[in-house]
């Protein structure tokens, strides 16, 4: 039986690109992919922050899985909340287990069986493995948006899966032709 939830919430599938006005230094230069957003709050994953101290092979071994591939992808810090929670953000394919279809092309799961499929693939360009997430209570994200902490742009699977991590922040903002390194949304009025 396929348990699929189609996410249709307002900012699900969008990027939150941190601006220079971001007051929380943990998110400076970060791109968050919003997976769920509704009246109860929001959940997102930082897509450009690999953890150099944690190897994917180590995580798999701790889960009791065999590791046969020599080259495995990075583990990303998806956010500061629940660093013991693991997620797979992936280009959609006919996975039958529990997952959320965020868009027609991008899905999210926490299932161990999906990890086994992912490890068997030849390309790590179809998924990100993340620990932790970014969470907002009801109304909290909206306040951050009003404070110009985030630039909201449509999510793009090429930015998530194909670009080097160091290019994702600028590339996501460039969707609107913005140079995020000089972007200042605080306007003066005469």
Swiss-Prot record:
Pfam families xref list: DUF179
One GO cellular component term noted in the UniProt record for this chain: cytosol
Disulfide bond entries: none
Domain of life: Bacteria
SUPFAM superfamilies to which the protein is assigned, alphabetical: VC0467-like
Signal peptide range in chain numbering: none
Family: Belongs to the UPF0301 (AlgH) family.
Protein name, as recorded: UPF0301 protein DP2218
Organism expressing this protein natively: Desulfotalea psychrophila (strain LSv54 / DSM 12343)
């Amino acid at each position: 039986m396929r348990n699929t939830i189609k996410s249709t919430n307002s900012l699900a599938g969008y990027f939150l690109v941190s601006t220079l006005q971001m007051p929380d230094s943990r998110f400076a230069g970060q791109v968050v992919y919003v997976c769920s957003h509704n009246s109860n709050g929001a959940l997102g994953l930082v897509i450009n922050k690999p953890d150099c101290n944690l190897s994917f092979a180590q995580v798999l071994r701790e889960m009791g899985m065999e590791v046969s591939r020599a080259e495995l992808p990075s583990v990303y810090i998806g956010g500061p909340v629940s660093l013991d929670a693991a997620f797979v953000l992936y280009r959609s394919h006919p996975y039958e287990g529990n997952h959320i279809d965020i868009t027609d092309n991008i899905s999210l799961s926490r299932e161990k069986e999906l990890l086994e499929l992912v490890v068997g693939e030849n390309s790590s360009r179809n998924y990100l493995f993340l620990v932790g997430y970014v969470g907002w209570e009801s109304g909290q994200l909206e306040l951050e948006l009003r404070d110009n902490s985030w630039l909201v742009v449509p999510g793009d699977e090429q930015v998530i899966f194909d670009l080097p991590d160091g290019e994702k922040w600028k590339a996501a903002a460039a969707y609107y032709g913005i140079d995020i390194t000089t972007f200042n949304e605080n306007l003066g009025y005469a």
